[in-house]
Regions:
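Phosphate-coordination/substrate-recognition cap region in phosphate-metabolizing enzymes
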Residues: 1-30
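Short, active-site-adjacent cap segments at secondary-structure transitions
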Residues: 11-12, 78-80
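Acidic, low-complexity terminal tails and accessory targeting/binding regions
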Residues: 12-23, 63-68, 84-128
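Short glycine/proline- and acidic residue-enriched helix-loop micro-motifs
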Residues: 29-49
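Conserved anionic group-binding/transfer micro-motifs
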Residues: 50-51, 72
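Generic structural signal for well-ordered alpha-helical scaffold segments
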Residues: 51, 55-63, 83
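Generic beta-sheet signal
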Residues: 68-74
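Alpha-helix N-cap/helix-start capping motif
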Residues: 76-77, 101
């Protein structure tokens, strides 16, 4: 399998909020972040921007995935955006999805359309 880096799949840019404790973010900003997909943390990107970026990545892989298996290794927010894309929902669904570490989510291509076939698989991980 060919490996390549695609910047479209990088983590959500939280800007000045990166690694900042939630308690240091104002209540007003947090409420806006959770309710307004166009809101951007200072110096970061919005959920709308993330969804557009990931949707472009998904569309680019659609034809390739019809011919062979494709694997994308990425972060929580792009995974949520890819699921939103596959389901045809809005970016707000991300608040209703929980993505674990090292999990597997599968999106198949059937008749040229995305189909979510599994979400948040962890069966491949060793039990503690």
């Amino acid at each position: 399998m060919l490996c390549r880096v695609d910047e479209g799949w990088i983590a959500l840019d939280f800007g000045e909020w990166e690694e900042k404790p939630i308690g240091e973010i104002t209540k007003e900003e947090w409420i806006r972040w959770r309710s307004d997909p166009s809101f951007m943390p200072p110096g970061g990107e919005s959920l709308e921007e993330l969804d557009r970026r990931v949707a472009l990545g998904c569309e680019a892989l659609l034809l390739e995935a019809e011919e062979s298996n494709v694997a994308v290794f990425t972060h929580v927010s792009p995974i949520k955006s890819a699921v939103s894309w596959a389901l045809g929902t809005s970016e707000q669904i991300s608040w209703n999805l929980s993505v674990g570490q090292a999990q597997i989510t599968r999106i198949a291509v059937r008749d040229g359309r995305p189909v979510l076939t599994s979400f948040n698989e962890t069966g491949h991980l060793k039990k503690p």
